Amino acid sequence: MLNRKLVNRVEYFRVIVMAFAAFVFNTTEFVPVALLSDIADSFQMPVSNTGLMITIYAWIVSLCSLPCMLMTARLERRRLLISLFILFIASHILSAFAWNYEVLLIARAGVALTHSIFWSITAALTIRIAPKNKKTQALGLLALGSSLAMVLGLPLGRIIGQAFGWRTTFTLIGVFAALILILIVRLLPKIPSQNAGSLKSLPVLARRPMLITLYIFTILVISAHFTAYSYIEPFMIQIGRVSANKATAVLLIFGVSGVVASVLFSRLYRIAPIKFLLSSVAILTLALICLYGVSGISGAIFALVFIWGVAISALSLAMQMKVLQLAPDATDVATAIYSGIYNIGIGGGALIGNQVMQHLGLANIGYVGAVLGAVSIIWFILMFLKFSRVPLNIVNQ
C-alpha cells in the first residue's frame, strides 16, 4: 500500500512537470502581445508590422502540427520532449540576441515548430503518465498550467520587459525551460510511442463522423471566441470607456477564469461529456451577445468576461478530451489535426473581427462572434443526432 502511494506521488509529480511545461509554452506564445511596443521601438518599426510575428507564429503551428507529428510519430516520447526543449531553449537564446527583426522571426519560427509538436503529444502523454483513476484530473492540471500562463506568465513577462527590456523576458523564459528540461530528464521514464498513428490513420479518422463534426465545431467555436477576444482591449477602451489599466485587468480575469474552468472540468465533464460541451458553448454565445449591452457597466463587464473566460476554457478542455476519446488508436495524429484546426480558428476569428471593425464597427464584434457560436451549436446538435446511432466502433463516443 505504501509503495503504491509512493508510485502515485511520483506519477502525479510527473504530471505537475508537464503542467509547468504547458505554462512555459503558453507564456512564450502570448508574451509578445505584452512586448510588441518595446520590440517595435528596439527595431525602429511600427507596432502593426511587428505584430505580424504573432500571426506568423499561429500559422506555422497550424501548418506544421500534423506533418511534424507524423515525422516524429515513432520516436520515444521522453527523448522527443528533451529534443523539443533543447530547440525551444536555443530559439529563446537566439531571440534574446536577435540583431534584427528577421532574426527574431526565425527564432520565433523555431519556437512555433516546438509548439506544434508539443501540443500534439502532450495531452495523450500526460494521461499516460498520470496515476490510475486520475486521468481527467491530470488533463485539468495540464490546463491549469496553461491558464497560469495568462495569470502569471503574461503580466510577469510584461513587468520584466518594461524594467529590463524584452530580451530579458525571453532569456528568463529560456532559463525556466532549462529547469523544466532538467526535471524531464530526471523524472520521466522512457515512454514508447503508443497509438500515435501514421498517414494510414488519416483515412480511418476521416471515416469517423463525430470526429469530423468535432473538428468543424472547433473551427466555428474558436473563430467565434477570437472574433471578439482578439480585439477585447480596444473594445474595452473605446466602447466600454475604461482605463488602459482596467482593460489590461480584463486579460488577467480571463486567466483566472481558466483556473476555475479546469476545476469544473475535472469534476463535471466525466458525468455528462456532451452536456458539458454544449453548455459551455451556449454560455460562451450568451456572453458574446451581452458583451456590448454591459460594456458601459464596470462591474457587469468584469463579471461577464469572467463567465466568458470560464466557458471558453472549459470548452477547450472538453473538445480536447473528446478528440482523445474519439481517436484512442491514433491520439497523436488526431490531436495534431486538432491543434492545427484550433490555430486556424484563432487566425480566422482575428480576421473576421478585423473585417467587422472595418465594415460594421468595433461595437459589433460580440454579436458576430455570437452568430458563429449559435451556428456551432446547431451544427453539433444536428450531427450528433444524425450519427449518435452509428456503431460505437465508428463513432467512438
UniProtKB/Swiss-Prot annotation:
Keyword flag Cell inner membrane: yes
GO molecular function terms attached to this record: carbohydrate transmembrane transporter activity
Parts of the chain that traverse the membrane: 15-35, 51-71, 80-100, 103-123, 137-157, 169-189, 209-229, 246-266, 277-297, 299-319, 333-353, 365-385
Subcellular location: Cell inner membrane
Membrane topology per record: Multi-pass membrane protein
Sorted UniProt keywords: Cell inner membrane, Cell membrane, Membrane, Sugar transport, Transmembrane, Transmembrane helix, Transport
Pfam families on file: MFS_1 (PF07690)
Any one of the GO CC terms: plasma membrane
CDD domains named in the record: MFS_NepI_like
InterPro entries the record matches: MFS, MFS_dom, MFS_Efflux_Transporters, MFS_trans_sf, Sugar_effux_transptr_put
Record-stated family: Belongs to the major facilitator superfamily. SotB (TC 2.A.1.2) family.
Role noted for this protein: Involved in the efflux of sugars. The physiological role may be the reduction of the intracellular concentration of toxic sugars or sugar metabolites.
Protein name: Probable sugar efflux transporter
Organism: Mannheimia succiniciproducens (strain KCTC 0769BP / MBEL55E)
